[in-house]
Amino acid sequence: MSVAAENQDSATMYEVMKGTVSAREAIQHTPSCDIIPANTILAGIEQELHNVGKEMTLREKLRDEQTGVAEEYDYILIDCPPSLGLLTVNALTAADYLLIPTMAETFAASGITQLYDTYKSVKKYTNPALRIDGVLLTRTERTRVTKTIQELTGKIANYMGADVYRTTIRSNVIIKEAQAVQENVFDYIESKAHRG
């Protein structure tokens, strides 16, 4: 969602993962959703988590009886970086379902198969209840290339026992603009409408 912390002193997912603040304390409320923002410092958490069971850290932070927030929400979306490191493993371990967003680009298909391998490992060792909900194509355009990639993605999804959503996210300058100003898309659209 590309949302930064409200200010430099706001707690982020980094502090939650490190254990210096609770998930509840880090939540920021926006008109459209509640978020726990992240920043580039979060990438360093992989070097800092040395404890046994480090792949369970996020699950424990979200589900803790005293300080967790999992029971307060119908849905919690965990937006992961495009890597398959400890942060992604933590997210998969904490999740009930895996929604795989993938760009409608040729090389993105190989990323799906790599993620599937990680999914199988997490399912085997840390979260046997994890299920693939589906594959969501992003940055689509009305071109033959996109249609070809949709077909390829469909074959890969079928191999994984998943479906490709009929809904896609088309290429849109508003998404890029929202990322540039570090706002979630919904708030950005609303603020843009008020600006005229």
Regions found by a protein language model. Give the residues of each.
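P-loop NTP-binding core
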Residues: 1-196
